[in-house]
């Protein structure tokens, strides 16, 4: 481990220990159990979104693996998937979305590509981040009673104790992002702590209750740059109106989504086939997968130092910027904007 990383780790450890001592002295803070009201979430979804099958990103939170809750308390799961490859839009969000795209997320090399790359036969090296966590939903009344604020950090540690260091780091970063996010002009965003608040935000931004939700069929651990894939097929999922909302899970003891919209956008379902020898079962590199690519069409307010712009000698506004989304992401689009192909809707991970 590098000295700088070791110093940062020790600083975090000392900070967590101090907060833990403070949390022990808190009066009136009750420990929160992690109920998983799957039937309530399902009933709400069917009532509010009768035209949208539940996407995998939501389904997998209804019946999370048993080691997820253990991971919250330090038994591995968040160690495997929670680091998000050290700095994508999983590891803290405060390094990713919170600074108007001036660094972090939009400065990750290989993360972005031009829309022209999405042509059958093209060879690309996709960068798809791993999932943040698979923490269960809380009932809305319980979730709403927990202020998403940095000053509430010690309370949250006490409510969900014991908490692993990785999870504590995720909580701190999520709270900081939700409280101090600095969006680019025109961006709409929210931290949603229940299924109801996720759906309500999407409906509010898109101006309709008639929505469809999509998630990609990609590995939970993501795909690191360097693995070559051929673009086998491309289908436009949403783009008739150009407005979508994207929600990503954040590392937290219960399901918390970072939802935002930087419109106009186009969304593509992209079938990718590995060009690597030995890919497939047991290799960690899937032979074939169906990903979701989001293309931001108006990049005039993006940072000119975005690696994609620098690499292609482009200025903000010269071209659209595309990126793939992780397995735990949900993309929302008005039903009227969803592209149909023949008599069938696209089937990607609904």
Swiss-Prot record:
PROSITE patterns tied to this protein: BURP (PS51277)
Tissue expression summary: Expressed in roots and panicles.
Organism field: Oryza sativa subsp. japonica
Keywords, comma-separated and alphabetical: Signal
BURP domain span: 112-335
UniProt key word Signal: yes
Signal sequence, renumbered to the chain: 1-23
SMART domains found in the cross-reference section: BURP
Protein's name in the database: BURP domain-containing protein 10
Presence of keyword Signal: yes
